[in-house]
């Protein structure tokens, strides 16, 4: 078995007193599977890519938020103008008396829900705090580490306030149409999605929404939905014993032959080949 890449604190933190830092990825390149001896928050600003976290694939784009524990293994592939930021931190170095464990999923162990989403409002507020945090964490002046930790605490609480599960916006949300569209797409894994119906409900222009979606994500709406479904199929093929025909239905494909064609085109192998290859990992 090949030696797994592990990213180390000494390469990312200025000193053993520093608890928090920001690692920009403008853009994020393909990155082989790795672990860390620190933890991180990942926020995606635009573009798209394939993020595989603990053998589960996610097609990521603007607004995706991940809580990564040191022991988690993850990688990036099939990236397309993917812009994100990693807010990296060492739990054992944090000194503020906050309920870190309650606020950060998987803070003390690789558990809890790692994947969430942020709408445009949450993204704008997070970006502002991260900018301040990045500035403080790069300073070599008195109390820079303390200021950075205060800002990190603010960011963590802000994310708690604004995050939501990928397929369920809060009913009182005032998020943009693009946020609502991405959420509706995530909730359409098993059922058909009709863009014209969505636009009628939202009283918006289908053409303008298509353009806005492509500008922000680097994909068409159909490409995104298809790839989200294929990612879910990959997960089910590896981690369930469902028949391929049943997985096809679970992932919104009415015809299993068409599912096989789409899956093969997206992954380079048939569903059966994928299942056989990845079952050897478990």
From Swiss-Prot:
Alphabetized InterPro entries for the sequence: AraC-bd, Homeodomain-like_sf, HTH_AraC, HTH_AraC-typ_CS, RhaR_RhaS-like_N, RmlC-like_jellyroll, RmlC_Cupin_sf, Tscrpt_act_RhaR
Keyword Electron transport appears in the UniProt entry: no
GO annotation terms (biological process): positive regulation of DNA-templated transcription; rhamnose metabolic process
Segment forming the signal sequence: none
Domain of life, source organism: Bacteria
UniProt GO MF annotations: DNA-binding transcription factor activity; sequence-specific DNA binding
Subcellular location(s) per record: Cytoplasm
HTH araC/xylS-type domain mapped to chain residues: 179-277
Site description Interaction with sigma-70, residues in chain: 246
Assigned GO CC terms: cytoplasm
Keywords on record: Activator, Cytoplasm, DNA-binding, Repeat, Rhamnose metabolism, Transcription, Transcription regulation
Gene3D superfamilies: Homeodomain-like, Jelly Rolls
DNA-binding positions: 196-217, 244-267
SUPFAM superfamilies found in the cross-reference section: Homeodomain-like (SSF46689), RmlC-like cupins (SSF51182)
Statement: the UniProt record of this protein carries the keyword Transcription: yes
Subunit structure: Binds DNA as a dimer.
Chain's role: Activates expression of the rhaSR operon in response to L-rhamnose.
The protein's name in its UniProt record: HTH-type transcriptional activator RhaR
């Amino acid at each position: 078995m090949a030696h797994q890449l592990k990213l180390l604190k000494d390469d990312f933190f200025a000193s053993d007193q520093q608890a928090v830092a920001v690692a920009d990825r403008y853009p994020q390149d393909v990155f082989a599977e790795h672990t860390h001896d620190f933890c991180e928050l990942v926020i995606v600003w635009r573009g798209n890519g394939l993020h595989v976290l603990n053998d589960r694939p996610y097609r990521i784009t603007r607004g995706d938020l991940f809580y990564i524990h040191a022991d988690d293994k993850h990688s990036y592939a099939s990236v397309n103008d993917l812009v994100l930021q990693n807010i990296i931190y060492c739990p054992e170095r944090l000194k503020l008396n906050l309920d870190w464990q309650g606020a950060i999923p998987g803070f003390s162990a690789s558990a809890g829900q790692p994947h969430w989403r942020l709408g445009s409002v949450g993204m704008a507020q997070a970006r502002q705090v991260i900018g301040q945090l990045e500035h403080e964490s790069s300073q070599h002046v008195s109390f820079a580490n303390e200021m950075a930790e205060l800002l990190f605490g603010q960011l963590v609480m802000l994310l708690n306030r604004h995050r939501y599960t990928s397929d369920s916006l809060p009913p009182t949300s005032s998020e943009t149409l693009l946020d609502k569209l991405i959420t509706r797409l995530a909730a359409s894994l098993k059922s058909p999605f009709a863009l014209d119906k969505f636009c009628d409900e939202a009283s918006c222009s289908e053409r303008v929404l298509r353009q806005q979606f492509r500008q922000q994500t680097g994909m068409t709406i159909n490409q995104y939905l298809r790839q989200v479904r294929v990612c879910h199929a990959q997960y089910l093929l590896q981690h369930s014993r469902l028949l391929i025909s049943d997985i096809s239905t679970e992932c919104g494909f009415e015809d299993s032959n068409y599912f096989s064609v789409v899956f093969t085109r997206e992954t380079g192998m048939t569903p059966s080949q994928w299942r056989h290859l990845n079952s050897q990992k478990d």
